[in-house]
């Protein structure tokens, strides 16, 4: 069983150090410390365990070290930055594991960009040696890339010419969409196994600069000092966003921000599921579905209303703790429970308590900690969007689908709401946070995506005073079905049985197509185009067949392709 929880004192492959407002994440992969047997992580290659540590470090920088302005990602190995994902590990892994591995690494790199865009940190990739494949994909997720000019070091995306697959962690998309490299040059770069060295890499826009070995560290340090001296990083921001960001930060005492500690989750693994403090996951393995229940906050009389009170609670503050638990539950299901095809999402609690939390978050959204909590909630909800499981929201008496928890319902593929006033009223409610605090990968809110055909209905929903009962929610277009008490149990049972009887492959593709209506962004191109093509290629004989390139990499045998284009 793979565990996604870790902490700096447990890291095997990364060294995280912080000096004032500068953090350094140095990659030093221990080749014998692997997630599975049968391979060694040479040349700073990585497996899922390496990336779990990276994801944890980035998360901790945001919450535990908010004063950090610059993050330098480097390597402690001489003449090598990172050789990317370990090829033998990929070649011998199941298709499902390959898919989830690439999805998680993509989410980690998107989290780096989210930090740059919304929290103002600038990430610098200091390539002290060759960065190939996933190594360059990690670098290109950063804001700036600097390569050592030692006559040997290069950057490359060699997956197509060497392995017969794609750079699966966003490389192709970021080359043309983020670095804005010309298409013809990107084509050459992506089929050139040996890659490009400093001068041409800079000329083509694949790196920002290159420095000789004797001046490399000095030059990196100078650039770091230059960025750290600026009042606040404005990477990837418009002028208006930058001004608003700086103004909000200046409202805090002398600009000083003290972080909070992210403690280990209270988590119990049981034969039939996982129990957290606020989240419960029950696995019905024979029926191939899970019940995911999220508890609302404690009574509003005890809820904090000021940033100081929130910071005092630290990671035990309900919206942060519950979303950390939800995040872990989603990852656990993805990797450890592949045959669970459907997740029934429920909530329990008082709608007014959830709305009280949202009111506090909205009122203090410019405070660094509240901002990070909101951004984290948005990332977890996007992880739910990108999870290859069906989600049905079940709204019963005692549910609290409101505000930030309403997003769980909106992220679900269907919703069922009991319409039986005699048994106890069911209701759902929006808050101001539903209007823009939790964007999807396509940049839209889930309500915007829901009402693409009728924006005026969206305005009416957001302007609605009070909660929606079942009939009102149905009329407003918020709910899929509103069965009465006579049909409730049968309708839920039949819906579960029907969904779990369908092809999981077809459902994954169908859901990915239906969940992201509206515009396309770099993120949706990565997840919906690059990832989809990579997943297809991962099953093709030219990659993984007996004579495929991935299968034969590193062997004395040569790949033989079926040259029919498909």
Question: What residue ranges belong to the model's regions?
Answer:
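C-terminal alpha-helix plus adjacent terminal tail
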Residues: 1-52, 57-69, 76-83, 96-99, ...
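Hydrophobic, small-residue-rich alpha-helical packing segments that form membrane-like cores
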Residues: 84-96, 100, 104-115, 128-144, ...
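Catalytic-core regions built around general acid/base machinery
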Residues: 107, 111-118, 376-384
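A short, small-residue-rich loop immediately preceding and capping a beta-strand
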Residues: 119-131, 388-398
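Short, well-ordered beta-strand core segments
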Residues: 123, 145-146, 210, 391, ...
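CoA-thioester-processing core
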Residues: 132-189, 402-460
């Amino acid at each position: 069983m793979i565990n996604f929880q870790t902490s700096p004192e447990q890291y095997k492959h990364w060294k995280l150090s912080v000096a004032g407002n500068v953090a350094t994440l140095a990659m030093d992969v221990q080749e014998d410390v692997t997630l599975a047997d049968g391979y060694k992580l040479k040349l700073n290659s990585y497996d899922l365990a390496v990336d779990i540590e990276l994801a944890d470090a980035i998360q901790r920088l945001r919450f535990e070290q908010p004063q950090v302005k610059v993050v330098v990602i480097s390597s402690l190995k001489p003449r090598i930055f990172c050789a990317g994902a370990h090829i033998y590990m990929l070649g011998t892994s199941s298709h499902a594991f390959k898919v989830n591995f690439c999805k998680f690494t993509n989410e980690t790199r998107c989290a780096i960009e989210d930090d740059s865009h919304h929290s103002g940190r600038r990430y610098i990739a200091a390539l002290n040696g060759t960065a190939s494949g996933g190594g360059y994909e990690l670098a290109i997720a950063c804001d700036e890339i600097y390569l050592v000019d030692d006559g040997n070091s290069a950057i490359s995306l060699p997956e197509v010419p060497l392995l017969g697959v794609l750079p699966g962690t966003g490389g192709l998309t970021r080359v043309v969409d983020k670095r804005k490299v010309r298409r013809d040059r990107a084509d050459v770069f992506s089929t050139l196994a040996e890659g490009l060295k400093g001068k041409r890499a800079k000329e083509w826009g694949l790196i920002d600069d290159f420095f000789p070995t004797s001046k490399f560290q000095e030059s990196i340090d100078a650039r770091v000092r230059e960025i750290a001296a600026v009042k606040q990083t404005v990477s990837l921001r418009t002028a208006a966003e930058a001004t608003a960001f700086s103004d909000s930060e200046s409202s805090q005492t002398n600009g000083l921000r003290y972080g909070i500690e992210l403690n280990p989750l209270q988590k119990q693994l049981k034969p039939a599921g996982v129990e957290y403090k606020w989240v419960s996951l029950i696995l019905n393995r024979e029926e191939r579905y899970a019940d995911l229940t999220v508890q609302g906050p404690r009574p509003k009389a005890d809820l904090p209303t000021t940033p100081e009170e929130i910071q005092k609670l630290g990671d035990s503050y309900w919206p942060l703790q519950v979303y950390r638990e939800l995040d872990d539950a989603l990852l656990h299901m993805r990797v450890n429970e592949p045959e669970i095809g459907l997740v029934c999402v429920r909530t329990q609690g008082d709608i007014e308590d959830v709305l009280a939390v949202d009111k506090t978050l909205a009122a203090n959204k410019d405070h660094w900690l509240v901002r990070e909590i909101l951004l984290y909630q948005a990332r977890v909800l996007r992880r739910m969007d990108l999870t290859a499981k069906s989600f049905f929201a079940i709204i019963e008496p005692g549910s609290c689908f409101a505000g930030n928890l309403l997003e769980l319902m909106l992220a679900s593929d269907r919703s069922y709401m009991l319409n039986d006033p005699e048994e106890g009223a069911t209701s759902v409610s929006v808050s101001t946070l539903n209007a823009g605090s939790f964007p999807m990968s396509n940049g839209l809110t889930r309500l915007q995506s829901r009402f693409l055909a009728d924006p005026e209905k969206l305005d009416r929903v957001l302007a609605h005073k009070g909660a929606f009962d079942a009939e009102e929610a149905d009329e407003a277009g918020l709910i899929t079905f509103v069965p009465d008490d006579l049909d409730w149990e049968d309708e839920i049972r039949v819906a579960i049985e029907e969904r779990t009887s369908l092809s999981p492959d077809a459902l994954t593709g169908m859901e990915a197509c239906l969940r992201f209506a509206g515009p396309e962004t770099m993120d949706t191109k990565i997840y919906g185009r690059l990832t989809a093509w990579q997943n297809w290629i991962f099953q093709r004989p030219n990659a993984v067949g007996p004579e495929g390139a991935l299968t034969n990499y590193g062997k004395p045998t040569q790949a033989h392709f079926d040259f029919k284009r498909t």
